[in-house]
Each structure stands twice: as structure tokens, then as C-alpha cells.
Amino acid sequence: MSATLALTEQLIARASVTPDDQHCQQIMTERLAALGFECETIASHGVTNLWAVKRGTDGRDGKLLAFAGHTDVVPTGPLEQWTSPPFVPAHRDGKLYGRGAADMKTSLAAFVVASEEFVAAHPDHRGAIAFLITSDEEGPATDGTVKVVELLQERGERLDYCIVGEPTSTAELGDVVKNGRRGSMSGELVIKGVQGHIAYPHLAKNPIHLLAPALAELAAEQWDAGNEYFPPTTWQVSNLHAGTGATNVIPGHADLLFNFRFSTASTVEGLQARVHAILDKHGLEYTLKWSVSGLPFLTPRGELSGALEHAIRTETGITTELSTTGGTSDGRFIARICPQVIEFGPPNGSIHKIDEHIEVRFVDPLKNVYRRALEQLIA
């Protein structure tokens, strides 16, 4: 069994459901400390975070490549639906099964073993290697990576490159990497009406009827055309509720929850202003609360994307696709302190599902791609 596969199994065996790290980071810390990493645990409200760094011969002047990821996993769902226990690594038909196999304990193991091999081959490496690991990525993400980033900002720490080990591949390892992500902004809209008897609508104001024309306009609006890297911004309703449950009462208010997934072609302020303008045009009486969970970020083609594309092509023969599709990730926080952030990891077809797994044939090539990136960027 390869070192990467063995470490992956060791991590899967830890039932590290958010925010419980279950000592996964301790396992990683022991391996990294043996390589000369300075390891720091940063705890916050039950969340465990790890910042580990090994400087090269250039000291603080050298380029720094960080590996970022999470030890936490999503809940298993009904245990009886799993073919084998989710926290007991199991091999079947060339696949390794277990919660976190794809998202993202294989990436964590590959990070560690790639670093071990790199340091052994390049003991006098010039640049620095760092690890930024959290147990709060699958949950609220309020005490994890964002807290470490804030601390690093206070210290004036500079990151030059960051590889986030999210499972970005689809059919084959390396066919897709993420060089950016869309922003996410949600709104809680309350339309005010006047409750009344449904037989006397002239004595009431139906907030559903009042909302309907504005809702149709919002749904049909083209917010932007996207750009070279991003698809057009989308606006979607996630929840709509009104009424008491009775069939003879006009509701007094209607509650609407919606979400924007937006590109760098739009801004928070611009999107908010356009929503308010549409609501105001229709003469609605309303309250609207906004929350922004992440801003869009983009890493244009450059040193990091080039290194990963070359490493993937050399290792797998695949020409990778740069993509910004999908949901948010911790990359949105890291982009605050790092100009080049790219996500790359194993295929994502089974993530968050019953019987999550990774094909064993991808495990060591993933490690090799990470090692090749180290060699190209900081050796």
C-alpha cells in the first residue's frame, strides 16, 4: 500500500463531522513537524485550525506555496444505506469507500506525502511550503479558514500561491481545476400587506398579488453577461411563504428568500441597487435584509495555473479545463491574502453522497501532481 493511500485510510477512520476534527490535524502535524514545519493550532469556538510553515533557504523573501483544505466532513446520512460503515475504510472494485474519501481526505494525505517527497528530494528548497487546514469548511465557515486568514493578515504574512484540495475533477483526475468562484449573496424580503377576509379583498391588501409583478421582473432580469471566466450572474428564489394555512384569510405579509451567484462582472452594491429599484418601481412596502457569504475571486492564467496545467498533463496526459462553476469554497477567504488561488482535487461524483469513494488509481497521481507543482514553483 502506498504512503498516500495509507494516510488517506488513517484520516477516513476519524469521524470528523463538522466541527469535530477528531485529531486528524494532529496526525498531519506529527508528519509535518518531522519535516521541520513550524506548526500552530488555532482554535476558535470548537473549531480546530492548523497553520504550518516550512521556510526555504530564501527565508521570508522566498515564494510561499500553501496547501489549503479541511479535515471536517458532512454527516453520513442513514447508516443503514451505506454498503460498509462510513468511517471504516473499505476497498471494493478498485475504489476506496468512506466519508471524506473524495472530499477531501485524499487531498490532505496527498498534500502531506507530496511535501515529504519534495523535502527529501530538495532539502535546500528555496521557497516556503505552508498548510492552512480547518475543521469548519462544511459548516458555518465562521471560525475556520477566515479566522486564520484574519490572523495572517494581522501578522503581515504573504502567500504567493495557494492550492485548495477541493474535489474539482469530474470524470478523470485533472480534467477540471477551479481558478475562481462566483460570489454568493442572499436576501430576506418581507412584503407588507393587510390581512383580511378573502371574501372582502377591497378591505385587505394581498402581499402575494402585490409581489407577483415584481417577482416576474426579477426572475426575467439579465443581471450581466458574464465574462471570459464567469457565466452570467443568476438570481434564484429559494423560499416563498405567505398565509396562515387557512383558505379564507388574505395574508398580512409574504416572505421571500433569494440568492445571487454573481461574477466579477457585477458588484454587491450594483446588484442590491437594482433589486431595490425594481421593488420600488412596483410601489411595494417592504423590508429587505442582505447577507454576503462570499465575494467572487479569480486567478487569471499565470505561474500557478501554468504549473498545475503542466503537472497534470505530465502526470495524466490530460489537458485541463479552467473553470469557475460550482458553489463557494474557502478559496474566497484565502484570495484576500493570496493573489493566485486555484482549487484542484479528485473527481467529485460521489461527494456528500451515501457510499462516497475515490478510485484508488487516482490517489498517487494526485500526490504526484502536487509534488510536481512544488518542484516547479519553489524548488
Swiss-Prot record:
Provide the protein name.
Answer: Succinyl-diaminopimelate desuccinylase
Residues the record lists as binding Zn(2+) 2: D103, E138, H352
Q: Where is the active site?
A: D72, E137
Q: What Pfam families does the annotation carry?
A: M20_dimer (PF07687), Peptidase_M20 (PF01546)
Recorded catalytic reaction(s): these are: N-succinyl-(2S,6S)-2,6-diaminopimelate + H2O = (2S,6S)-2,6-diaminopimelate + succinate
Q: Which family does it belong to?
A: Belongs to the peptidase M20A family. DapE subfamily.
Q: Which gene encodes it?
A: dapE
Q: Which SUPFAM superfamilies match?
A: Bacterial exopeptidase dimerisation domain, Zn-dependent exopeptidases
Q: In which pathway does it act?
A: Amino-acid biosynthesis; L-lysine biosynthesis via DAP pathway; LL-2,6-diaminopimelate from (S)-tetrahydrodipicolinate (succinylase route): step 3/3
Record flagged with keyword Hydrolase: yes
- What is the taxonomic lineage of the source species? Bacteria, Pseudomonadati, Pseudomonadota, Betaproteobacteria, Burkholderiales
Where is Zn(2+) 1 bound in this sequence? H70, D103, E166
Q: How is the cofactor bound, in the record's words?
A: Binds 2 Zn(2+) or Co(2+) ions per subunit.
Question: Tell me, what is an example of a GO biological process annotation in this record?
Answer: lysine biosynthetic process via diaminopimelate
In which organism is this protein found?
A: Burkholderia cenocepacia (strain HI2424)
- Gene Ontology molecular functions: acetylornithine deacetylase activity; cobalt ion binding; succinyl-diaminopimelate desuccinylase activity; zinc ion binding
Tell me which EC number(s) this protein carries.
Answer: 3.5.1.18
Q: Spell out the subunit comment.
A: Homodimer.
Report the protein's function. Catalyzes the hydrolysis of N-succinyl-L,L-diaminopimelic acid (SDAP), forming succinate and LL-2,6-diaminopimelate (DAP), an intermediate involved in the bacterial biosynthesis of lysine and meso-diaminopimelic acid, an essential component of bacterial cell walls.
Alphabetized, the UniProt keywords read:
Amino-acid biosynthesis, Cobalt, Diaminopimelate biosynthesis, Hydrolase, Lysine biosynthesis, Metal-binding, Zinc
- Please list the cofactors this protein needs: Zn(2+); Co(2+)
